[in-house]
Amino acid sequence: MSELKIKAAKAAIAYIEDDMVIGVGTGSTVNFFIKELAAIKHKIEACVASSKATEALLRAEGIPVIDLNSVQDLPIYVDGADEVNERGEMIKGGGGALTREKIVANVATQFICIVDESKVVKRLGEFPVAVEVIPMARSFVARQIVKLGGDPEYREGFVTDNGNIILDVFNLSFSTPMALEDSLNVIPGVVENGVFAKRLADKVLVASASGVNNLK
């Protein structure tokens, strides 16, 4: 599986141009992308990290990291996914960085999703949806999610980079992913959720034994 993740990471490097500021996601496939990026770090201007973990990895490779607030133009964002379909709709957030990932993805002109073939699905929903929640609202939000048909589980011992908690929600209906994304976000106490149906991936680079294909 690591070989496929490396393939996908290498394929994303082809989209990196000189003097670019690059948004960098979070997760195991992205970690391989960071390794590849380190080889051309002299060509790029800097990176914007979607998590403290990614920032630490970038800095360890000697890659400059800048704050998103100092960026006016972010041409590209590279990130993985827990699930992705052919339309570029995704479930993300298994690593708990979903809020910052969604922010950086929305700032970027182009969102490139890098995955191995196991992440490609016809219908989203096997993987639970991570929901970032203000701690005091945990029980209330969980009750509201149950009303939506979901089964929330508190992610024990995990605190997001924003100081919040995560509810992992199983068995949600994905008949209309965009409506689901909205219905979760309007619950008071919800910061963000891991359904990416409004900000789609522009390119989905899928690695398999036969090579890397663009799903979109």
Swiss-Prot record:
EC number: 5.3.1.6
SUPFAM superfamilies: D-ribose-5-phosphate isomerase (RpiA), lid domain (SSF75445), NagB/RpiA/CoA transferase-like (SSF100950)
GO terms under biological process: D-ribose metabolic process; pentose-phosphate shunt, non-oxidative branch
Coiled coil: none
InterPro entries: NagB/RpiA_transferase-like, Ribose5P_isomerase_typA_subgr, Ribose5P_isomerase_type_A
Keywords: Isomerase
Superkingdom, taxonomy of origin: Bacteria
Active-site annotation: 101
One of the record's GO molecular function terms: ribose-5-phosphate isomerase activity
Pathway(s) annotated for this protein in UniProt: Carbohydrate degradation; pentose phosphate pathway; D-ribose 5-phosphate from D-ribulose 5-phosphate (non-oxidative stage): step 1/1
NCBIfam families (UniProt xref): PRK00702.1, rpiA
PANTHER family with a match to the protein in the record: RIBOSE-5-PHOSPHATE ISOMERASE
Subunit structure, interactors included: Homodimer.
Function: Catalyzes the reversible conversion of ribose-5-phosphate to ribulose 5-phosphate.
Protein name per UniProt: Ribose-5-phosphate isomerase A
Organism, as annotated: Legionella pneumophila subsp. pneumophila (strain Philadelphia 1 / ATCC 33152 / DSM 7513)
